[in-house]
Amino acid sequence: MDMIKPDFQQIRRDKFRVEQMNDFPNTWTQQQHQNIRIPNNLDLIGILQNQISVPVQTDLYQDSAATFMNMPQSIHRDPQGPSNWRISDLSQPSTVNHGYDQAGIRPNNVADLLSDHFSSRNQILDRPLYVGRDSIPQSSMIRRSEVSCLDDNQKGCVTVACSGTGNEILRSSYDQGSSSGSYRGEFSFLPSLENQSVAHNASNWNHGPVNVTATSHTNSKKGFPLSLLSDIPPSRDVGNAAVLSTMNIHGPLGPFTGYASILKSSRFLEPAQKMLEEFCISYASKIISRSESTSMEDDDDDDDNLSGFSSSSEPLEPKNRLKKAKLLFLQEEVCKWYKLYNHQLQTVMSSFNTVAGLNTATPYISLALKRTSRSFKALRTAIAEHVKQISSHSSNGNNNNRFQKRQRSLIGNNVGFESQQQHIWRPQRGLPERAVAVLRAWLFDHFLHPYPTDSDKQMLATQTGLSRNQVSNWFINARVRLWKPMVEEIHTLETKAIKNADTSHNIEPSNRPNTVSSPSHEQTLTGLSGTKRSRLEYMDMVGFNRGNVSLTLELRRGVDNVIQTQTQDHQFGTGSQMFHDFVG
């Protein structure tokens, strides 16, 4: 009973495995024929009917499979070798070895019996299928096989032709994968040939009942000589889902689909990067150095020219000087933006160097640098030409400007001369000198009546550029500080003269006798009367107030006192002359 139990467990394992494969019908196409699985005879025949249109008699294989599965024997694996099997009969205690020998050359009795049985019943499948890179041989006599091919980029194929029982290989590979303790997916059904070369493995499989011809590169990874993958196998912690997810990635690879991350993990990254740096970066650096040297030479020449223009000893007009200042400011802005663009392009170049595979963009950046330097050079040349034109025009019209300035300085009036003589650094207090001069002239012209009317105030405000209130305030202050002291001084002089005349007139009649007036005396009287009449006419002409009280000094004037005015005519003449000299 203990010997029968392993058979039932093994059958349950086979059924579970077949159901699991049926749950994923697209694994053959999704994994791109990269797994080799050898199911039982019935599944193998179905696969051959789908892939190769060859008529196969299924009833014969069903009978042979039934007889083989109903054999009263138990199959056990030899722990010393993974491909050595023992078939133990339940009725006989002896154990017969039905696996390969150590050399893998001669099959055992059961394999011979089954192969003879299959070959006698059906002679359709005669030779294994060899699939290479170029073509598939045109042969209709093909043994039961299952073909697994690589991708177009990996250029490798493996053909497995089976002439023995598929259950032995299936069970041996399944037990071997389960006993190893790690899940390898469907690669666990392949025998492990880690320590053998590809040629030796191919010779061993060709001489055995299971013929395998491996056509692959010799640089395949160690441990998987028949593996159709070029990637590293997944670790023990990674499951089958992770393997399928990594294998099902299709589509073009680019810089935005993880291409840079794949290149970073490659061992060819560093030598390829060095080679690209030698051929691209060095050439681009030479171009950039040449362009920078030429641009710097041009900049130095332009600076020399501009400095020559600006250092000219001839002064410029204010208008031309302003234009030249604006042009020089634009030149500084152009230089600043050129340096900024150059720095930005250098930053872009360094960012391209950090990403593998994008170093080929460096020559294009050098072309952009040359284009930018050419544009900025054109701007600088245009600015330099404008500055040169301004300097030439200023030098031509320099003599005319000097002559005009001299004429203005000579023709200018005294007010302009005084304004030029005042110091610029001294703070200005009060009204401007030109306005004060205009107001003072009007005051002396109207000295006898220094009260301007509204129209006079408006006219003076227009001439001086002051407001009407400023004109009124100035006249108020001028009458108090300037005009009133002058009038008081004149009045004191007149009063002194009158007193002196009175004293002299009172003394003379008492000393002289009453005689008849001589003709000379009459002539003096007529002269005095003439001077009196002329003074009265002058007072009427200037509009002097002839009332009893003066508006400013409140002095009484006797109109009838003609004698005093006649006796003081010589005194008044002296005072009037002094007043005229003061005003003039």
Curated annotation (Swiss-Prot):
InterPro entries named in the record: HD, Homeodomain-like_sf, KN_HD, POX_dom, TALE_homeobox
UniProt-listed PROSITE patterns: HOMEOBOX_1, HOMEOBOX_2
Entry's Gene Ontology cellular component terms: nucleus
SMART domains: HOX, POX
Residue ranges, annotated region (Disordered): 292-317, 503-529
Family listed: Belongs to the TALE/BELL homeobox family.
Protein's name in the database: BEL1-like homeodomain protein 8
Organism of provenance: Arabidopsis thaliana
Lineage: Eukaryota, Viridiplantae, Streptophyta, Embryophyta, Tracheophyta
Gene that this polypeptide is encoded by: BLH8
